[in-house]
Swiss-Prot record:
Pfam families: zf-RING_UBOX. Keywords: Membrane, Metal-binding, Transmembrane, Transmembrane helix, Zinc, Zinc-finger. Residues 1-21, 202-213, 332-345 have a biased composition (Low complexity). InterPro entries: RING_finger_E3_ubiq-ligases, Znf-RING_euk, Znf_RING, Znf_RING/FYVE/PHD, Znf_RING_CS. One of its GO terms (biological process) is protein ubiquitination. GO terms for cellular component: membrane. One of its GO terms (molecular function) is zinc ion binding. The keyword Membrane applies. A zinc finger (RING-type) spans 58-125. PANTHER family: RING-TYPE DOMAIN-CONTAINING PROTEIN. The chain crosses the membrane at residues 236-256, 290-310. It comes from Homo sapiens (Human). This is RING finger protein 228. Residues 163-201 have a biased composition (Pro residues).
């Protein structure tokens, strides 16, 4: 009979211990709402059958995988990293191997150093052989590559690798066109048809005022092209005139010395004496050549001065001339001219 009593006592103690268990259940019930969101997220993930968003990024550079230079490469240890990070690890391993082979007694290689045809996992140090000693030969993680949401990546990644997301802000632009439609309300008032003409006159007035002050980029380029063409033509004219002057000068001197007067070459007839009957008559070619040479020399000097003036004149002078022609830009032109003088000094 003692055993049943003990059993009954045990059965009586179990109800007595129920308040504690009830308190534990209450604490668990209080903690349950805190982790309700996490449970809902886990449930959503398990229902969807897709890995969490953290699995779509490389654990080395924390960039999302893509189909180009950050392709998800699967190692033999089933760890996944992007192709670019694995390539950097391979290059560093090759550099460390070259540095270790230089001394006579090479030090102990680091744990991540592998043969040229293998790469060590940054997490577990497991060595994975590289096909053809290239990271490109590693297989891709097809589960991540096929299930990766591109739209989600474009929304979360501040610097997407493939392309920028489309700009939907331009779509409402056509909707901005309806505001001009309220213009029809003015027609119902036929009495004031004259007020509308003055606004166009006021709008047209600022146009001519702004024309002298502003210059379109096309006009500036055409002006620069014309100036460059004028300088080139002037330089060609100066060179041609100088060469022609030299040739004509030598030709004129030769004709004057040899055919300037009768007698032997190089000496004319003495003054006051008539030329001999057999002597050649003086040729006018020499004086003509000398005259043309002098004219060409003067022309070369003038053109050279004009070219130097056009090329080296200060911009303030041009601004002052344009401002004076515009009429309303006097103070601005003076300020520009003063700034140009200060910059020249």
């Amino acid at each position: 009979m003692a055993a049943p009593a003990s059993d009954s006592g045990g059965s009586q103690q179990s109800p007595s211990s129920s308040p504690g268990s009830r308190e534990g259940a209450g604490v668990a019930a209080k903690g349950a709402p805190d982790c309700g969101d996490a449970g809902a997220r886990d449930a959503a993930e398990t229902v969807s059958g897709l890995p969490p968003l953290e699995d779509y990024e490389c654990k080395i550079c924390y960039n999302y995988f893509d189909a180009d230079r950050r392709a998800p490469k699967l190692l033999a240890c089933l760890h996944t990293f992007c192709q670019e990070c694995l390539s950097q690890l391979q290059l560093r391993a090759a550099a460390a191997a070259a540095a270790a082979a230089a001394p006579e007694r090479p030090p102990r290689p680091p744990p991540w150093l592998c043969p040229p045809g293998a790469i060590a996992c940054p997490v577990c140090r497991h060595r994975t052989p590289l096909p053809d000693s290239r990271v490109h030969g590693l297989p891709n993680n097809t589960k991540l590559a096929e299930a990766f949401p591109l739209a989600l990546r474009a929304a979360h990644d501040p610097l997407p690798q493939d392309r920028l997301p489309p700009l939907p802000a331009r779509l409402p632009a056509p909707a901005a066109a309806p505001p001009p439609t309220p213009a029809p309300p003015p027609p119902p008032s036929p009495a004031p048809p004259q007020p509308p003409p003055p606004p166009p006159a006021e709008d047209a007035a600022p146009g001519p005022r702004a024309r002298p002050g502003l210059r379109a980029p096309g006009a500036y380029d055409s002006c620069q092209n014309c100036k460059r063409a004028a300088l080139t033509a002037g330089c060609v004219c100066v060179v041609f005139s100088f060469l022609s002057m030299v040739v004509l000068l030598f030709t004129g001197l030769i004709f004057v010395n040899h055919y300037g007067g009768g007698g032997t070459p190089g000496g004319g007839a003495p003054p006051g004496e008539a030329p001999a009957t057999g002597s050649p008559s003086p040729s006018p070619v020499g004086p003509i050549c000398l005259s043309v040479a002098s004219i060409l020399a003067l022309f070369s000097v003038v053109v050279t001065w004009v070219i130097c003036w056009l090329k080296y004149r200060p911009e303030g002078a041009a601004a002052g001339s344009t401002g004076g022609s515009g009429g309303g830009g006097g103070p601005r032109a003076r300020a520009a001219a003063g700034g140009a003088r200060r910059s020249d000094t």
